[in-house]
């Protein structure tokens, strides 16, 4: 007779088979797994119930942690809709635009349109919900490749977006408008449905972002077909510079986010001290901050490091081949010291006149390599693991913000460094440089430390002192980052950093 351990192992083997088939396991009852295995996995924390009869894969001990749900969220929506509604469903035009624009925040409510809709709201985990609305959908929908979601085609989504969307989600709306190469697809939707009111709104939207050619084409073509088109601008403001056509939504999104946030940072931040004349004196002050900075920066990320351990690795009394080989905290502390020295070198270049954005663009791969080199020394990581940005998806524990997918990271990072290079205000470079770095999350691990290094390199470019984010303010600091990521409000994060700058 099998032991309990053997039975548990058999159930886990069934779960493993499912995980080999799907990136994220979403189960409807016993359709894909036997009742006994389902119950055993659920009772032992390897599955969590989303709603009656629906489950997602989890890990024991993660009960109450939102990360599993946010990680599984869109996969669940796609599978639930496919099972319940077949192929005749899609997200609303507004939520389709969210996804086209690269918005990665998990919404409080998803609204699906389908002829089979029942107009009822289904409560899901952690105060999220799903409304399946009875409605006709576009003749053809776009199958989004990441999660398998059905979306409005981009042009049709722009035409049928609610007027309010252009005011509440102006970054997403403008990002999607900039993805349209010419007026043809928009006009096909408008002329097919005789949508003269919508034509006036979408023409005004294109004119708002500076695309006069598409705006004029929409108006003239619709009027040529006899429609009374009265152009109106659905936005409440104008972008500072015209937007150009971009295949990648992340390029436009990041530029618009920067434009939207920078003035608030300038308003809240103390005036920059200015150029540092005594470069060596400034670098000595950076050296004096090392121990304090290492303790707090590593503690923020959950590592157990003592002042004694930090001093041990600083003076070189660290022997990875001996007693510290399995001591992860020691490896991390040593890596932090090596990375800190690399950042110090970058700051030296900046203080001697190198453009701060160009300096960090060139040197941040070296910071990252030094941060993890001790793990290569002891054989935990390979050298190739430290080259380039991540190739897999990463999630932030407890956050509604889902970092960019690996392909998007490669689109986004050059934009970040261009923004840093061309930004005239050092406080904006510091606050937004840090925030955008962790928003993108270009590495599998160490993004918080890297973001704080970016912060201090940019602070140095304005003559501000090296600034430590204390672990005692971790909750406030993380909450402010979350608000900026999810709501687009940078004010709390700017206030936190401004209050720490001395």
Which ranges hold each PLM region?
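Conserved two-metal-ion catalytic palm core of "right-hand" nucleic acid polymerases
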Residues: 54
């Amino acid at each position: 007779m099998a032991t309990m351990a053997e039975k548990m192992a058999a159930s886990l083997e069934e779960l493993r088979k499912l995980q080999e088939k799907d990136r994220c396991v979403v189960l409807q009852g016993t359709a894909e797994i036997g009742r006994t295995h389902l119950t055993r996995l659920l009772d032992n924390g390897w599955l969590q119930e989303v709603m009656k009869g629906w489950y997602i894969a989890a890990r024991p001990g993660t009960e109450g942690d939102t990360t599993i749900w946010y990680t599984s969220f869109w996969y669940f929506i796609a599978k639930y809709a496919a099972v319940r509604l077949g192929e005749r469903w899609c997200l609303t035009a507004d939520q389709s635009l969210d996804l086209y624009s690269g918005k990665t925040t998990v919404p409080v409510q998803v609204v699906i349109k389908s002829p089979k809709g029942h107009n009822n709201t289904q409560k899901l985990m952690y105060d999220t919900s799903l409304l399946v609305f009875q409605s006709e959908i576009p003749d053809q929908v776009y199958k989004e490749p990441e999660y398998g979601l059905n979306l409005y085609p981009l042009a049709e989504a722009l035409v049928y977006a609610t007027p309010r969307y252009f005011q509440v989600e102006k970054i997403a709306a403008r990002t999607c408008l900039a993805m349209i190469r010419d007026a043809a697809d928009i006009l096909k939707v408008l002329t097919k449905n005789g949508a003269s009111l919508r034509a006036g709104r979408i023409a005004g939207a294109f004119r708002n972002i500076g695309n006069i050619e598409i705006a004029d084409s929409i108006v003239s073509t619709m009027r040529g077909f006899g429609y009374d088109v009265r152009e109106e601008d659905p936005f409440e403001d104008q972008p500072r510079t015209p937007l150009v056509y971009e295949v990648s939504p992340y390029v436009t999104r990041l530029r618009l986010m920067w434009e939207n946030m920078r003035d608030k940072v300038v308003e809240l931040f103390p005036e920059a001290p200015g150029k540092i004349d005594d470069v060596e004196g400034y670098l000595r002050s950076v050296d004096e901050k090392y121990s304090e900075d290492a303790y707090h920066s590593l503690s923020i990320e959950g590592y157990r490091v003592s002042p004694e351990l930090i001093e041990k690795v600083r003076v070189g009394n660290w022997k990875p081949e001996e007693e510290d080989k399995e001591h992860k905290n020691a490896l991390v502390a040593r890596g932090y010291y090596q990375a800190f020295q690399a950042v110090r070198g970058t700051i030296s270049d900046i203080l001697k006149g190198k453009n701060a954005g160009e300096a960090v663009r060139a040197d941040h791969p070296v910071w990252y390599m030094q941060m993890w080199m001790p793990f290569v020394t002891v054989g935990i990581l390979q050298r190739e693991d430290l080259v380039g940005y991540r190739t897999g998806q990463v999630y932030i524990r407890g956050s509604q913000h889902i970092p960019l997918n690996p392909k998007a990271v490669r689109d986004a990072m050059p934009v970040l460094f261009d923004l840093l290079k061309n930004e005239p205000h050092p406080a904006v470079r510091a606050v937004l440089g840090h925030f955008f770095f962790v928003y993108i999350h270009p590495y599998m691990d160490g993004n918080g430390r890297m973001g704080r290094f970016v912060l201090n390199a940019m602070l140095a470019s304005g003559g501000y002192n090296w600034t430590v984010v204390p672990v005692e303010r971790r909750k406030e600091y993380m909450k402010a980052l979350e608000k900026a990521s999810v709501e687009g409000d940078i004010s709390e994060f700017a206030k936190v950093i401004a209050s720490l700058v001395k």
